[in-house]
């Protein structure tokens, strides 16, 4: 699935991922290929973008996460955070 992570200042990640773990406003959410279309508000915490055995981490605060095009692995995950820092 294709993932973009942006803040008001910059795009911090644009690439493919096997899994995402994100801090939603009411608890953590996991996104895998084949996930249904989805929209949630982000809370404060660590966002993990997993690519095989590697994991890229960002500290995020506020914003939203959207999954579009759910189904056969062609999803796009958009993460627009009010604040993003490398973790």
Put a short name on every predicted segment.
Residues 2-87:
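Compact, glycine-rich, soluble single-domain proteins
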């Amino acid at each position: 699935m294709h993932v973009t992570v942006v803040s008001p200042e910059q795009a911090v990640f644009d690439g493919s991922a096997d899994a995402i773990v994100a801090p939603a406003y009411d608890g953590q959410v996991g996104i895998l290929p084949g996930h249904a279309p989805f929209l949630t508000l982000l809370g404060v915490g660590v966002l993990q973008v997993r690519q095989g055995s590697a994991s890229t981490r960002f500290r995020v605060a506020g914003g939203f996460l959207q999954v579009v095009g759910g189904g056969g692995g062609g999803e796009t995950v958009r993460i627009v955070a009010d604040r993003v820092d490398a973790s």
